[in-house]
Every structure is written in C-alpha cells, then in structure tokens.
C-alpha cells in the first residue's frame, strides 16, 4: 500500500467508526425504556430523539466547515489561523446552543404541532426534551472541536470521544433508571451526562495534544 493511501486510511477509518457510533446514543435510550412496560416511553424517546437529530443536523456545518477550513490553514502551517478557527467554531456553537435553550419552549411547541403525539407521549417527550436541551452547549461545542481535530488530520480523538460518550450513556442511564428508579428523566439525564463527558474529554485531549498552541490564543477579525 502506498504511503499516501495508508495516510488516508488512518484518517478515514476512525471517522467511519465515529459515524457508526452516532446513532447508538438514541438506540441505547430506546433499548432501556423498552423494558419499562409501556410503549409510551418508547414513543417519547423516539419523538425527543427525532427532534434533537433534526436540530443537530441543521448545525452540522459547524463540524464540516471547521474541518475544511482548519485543514487548509494547517496545510499552510498558519498556526494562528488554526487556533482562531477553533475559537470561532466553538464560540459560534456555544452561542447557538444558548439561543436554543432560550427558545426551547417555542421550538418544542412548534415541533409538536407537526408531530401530533398522544397526550401521554407528549407529556413524557416534553420532559425528555427540556432536560436534553441543556446538552446543546456540549453537543455544538463538541461539533467545533471534532471538526477541528479532523482538520488537523487527527480523527482518532473524535473516535475516542464517541466511544466514551456511548459507554458513559449506558452506565449513567442504566444506573439512573434501574438503581434510582427514574424513567424518562433518568434516560434524559444519562444522555446529558454523556454529552458533557464527551465535551470535557475533548477539551482535556486538546490541552494534552495541542496545548502548545495556546500561545496563538487570540481572535482577530
């Protein structure tokens, strides 16, 4: 195998693994509530998960755009621009996330007008949504981080983060549901914990692997 092909595979394979793990967060939640005895729980998680899939898909440009521009700056060895791109993408992600939190009620109401869930599903999905929406800063901030890592030709860190998120989600959700007696709120809190665990892990790994770039820590127009 040519060195160039090997380099491409080293970047592509971890990204493939990361993408495979993305749907697992929602599937894990559905699997857990499926044992609670009522199909309404599954419906609530399905509705809530669908809403967040749409929301985060809309803002997927944070990851893809950051990846492309970072790879260009990294190829030019423009390290100040590389760092500025990280700061900009994470800042935009956090700003958008806080707007989503402020607008969570009209977003949820508008979505339910289109979906028309039953009253029981609506009540549980509302609880799930209003807990998980607080994970938006972690998710959108992580979009910026993972896009930046990939642009730096390091797709292993996003893979490690994705795997860790799923493991934390399984442990936290199972513990909250079966040990603490929670139901939909336990699954939502487990997802929330996993999201912030992934975001914090991304920050720690950035500091460990790229902390030397802090000397370029500035934002220019």
Positions of predicted regions on the chain:
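Residue-level signature of transmembrane alpha-helical cores of multipass secondary-active transporters
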Residues: 11-19, 53, 93, 132, ...
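Helix-loop interface residues and adjacent transmembrane-helix termini in multi-pass membrane transporters
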Residues: 24-27, 35-39, 73-76, 151-152, ...
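Interfacial helix-capping/hinge residues at the ends of transmembrane alpha-helices
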Residues: 30, 67-71, 108-109, 146, ...
